[in-house]
Amino acid sequence: MDMSSANSLRPLFAGYPFQGQGRVNQLGGVFINGRPLPNHIRLKIVEMAASGVRPCVISRQLRVSHGCVSKILNRYQETGSIRPGVIGGSKPKVTSPEIETRIDELRKENPSIFSWEIREKLIKEGFADPPSTSSISRLLRGSDRGSEDGRKDYTINGILGGRDSDISDTESEPGIPLKRKQRRSRTTFTAEQLEALERAFSRTQYPDVYTREELAQTTALTEARIQVWFSNRRARLRKHSGGSNSGLSPMNSGSSNVGVGVGLSGATAPLGYGPLGVGSMAGYSPAPGTTATGAGMNDGVHHAAHAPSSHHSAATAAAAAHHHTQMGGYDLVQSAAQHGFPGGFAQPGHFGSQNYYHQDYSKLTIDDFSKLTADSVSKISPSLHLSDNYSKLEAPSNWSQAAYHAAANYNAHVAQHQLNDYAAAAAHGNPASAYSHPLPTQGQAKYWS
C-alpha cells in the first residue's frame, strides 16, 4: 500500500458535529463539562414537574441525568429561581421589609457598625422578631454586592460568559407554583390488625390476592400496606431464625431422647425414639466390608457397667443392660464383662433367624432397628415399657404383626434362659463356654431383606 492510498483513508466515525468539550451522557443527551444546562431546558424541567410529570420521566424525555433534574427542582423549590451559579442555593428571606429598611438606615448612619450592634438596636427599638446576627450579616453583604462599584459578577454565567448571561429576572424566576412532594407517614397498626395479620402469616407467608382482599376488608388496610407488612414480616423471620437451628441434623432434630444407648466401639450414643424411629444412627458408620461384631458389644457392656450416676438412664442396646437402679442384675452384667462372656449374651434381639449385630447396617431399615431396640430393652429392663408404647402406635400396613409377636415371644424365652445360665456361671466361677447357647437360627421370620 503506497502513501497516497494510505492518506486517502478516512475514519468511519468523524466525531460529533459540536466538537470541542461536548460529551454525550448515558441517556444520549449532549452536555459540555463545566457549563450549566441552558435556561430553556431548566425552564422545561420546572414546567414538566409542575404539570405532574415524575423526575424519572423528565430525565428520560429531556435526556438529562436524574441527579441534575433533582438538583434543579430542589433549588427552585427553595429559592424560586432556575438561575445557575449559586452553590447550595440562597436562603429564603426571613426578615420583613420594615426591618430591612431600618437595617439599611443604621448602616448608612454608621458604615462600620457590627451585625450584633444592629440587632441590639432593633431589640431596643421594640421590633418583635429581630433577625439573627447571621441574617443581618447576609443582608449587609447583599447590599454591598448590589452597590454600583463596578465590581465583576463572579457567578458561573459571569465567569464563563455564556449566552445565558443576559437572562432577565423574569426568565430566571418563572414563578411557576411547584408542589412539594409530601412524604408518606409511617403506618401504625392497631392490636386487632396485628393479630389478624399474624394469624394469616401463621397460615401462609405468601398470601394470594384473595387472602389480601379478605385481610383488607377485615383490617381496613390497603392491599399495598398488607403486602409490605408480609414482606417485612418474612424478613424479620429470616433474621431471627438464621442461626437458631444450627448444629441440628435431620436425623435428631425432631426426635426425643428416651435414655437408651448403643455401645458401638466403646461409646454410648443416645437414641432418639421419635418420628424417624432412631435418632443417632448417623453417628455410626462401620468400615466398608465390616460388620458390628461381639467385640464392639463387649466394649459397650464394659462402658455401661461403669455408669457413674443414678441420674443418668444410660444403657446399651448391645448388651441391653440398664441402670442398676432399674435392673437387679447390674452385678451380673459387671461380672459377665469381667469373665469375658460373649458379647450379646443378654441380647434377646436375634430378630428373625439372624443376629442384628452380625448383620451389616446397610441391610437394616430404620423401622427394623426401632422395633428391635424397643423389644430388647423392654424384655431385659421391665421398668421401660417401650414395647407397650410401641404397640399403641400406628403400624405400617406392610408389617406382619403375627410373625412379629411370635418372634418376640421366642426371643423372650431365649433371653430368660440365657440370663439364668450366665447367672449360674457368674456365681460358680465357671467358664462362659459351659453355659453358652448357640444363636437361634430357625423358627422365626426375617424382617429385613
Curated annotation (Swiss-Prot):
This is Protein gooseberry-neuro. Belongs to the paired homeobox family. CDD domains: homeodomain, PAX. Residues 141-154 have a biased composition (Basic and acidic residues). Expressed in a single-segment repeat in the neurectoderm during germ-band extension and later in single neurons during neuronal differentiation. Residues 20-143, 182-241 bind DNA. The gene is gsb-n. The modification Phosphoserine is found at residue 165.
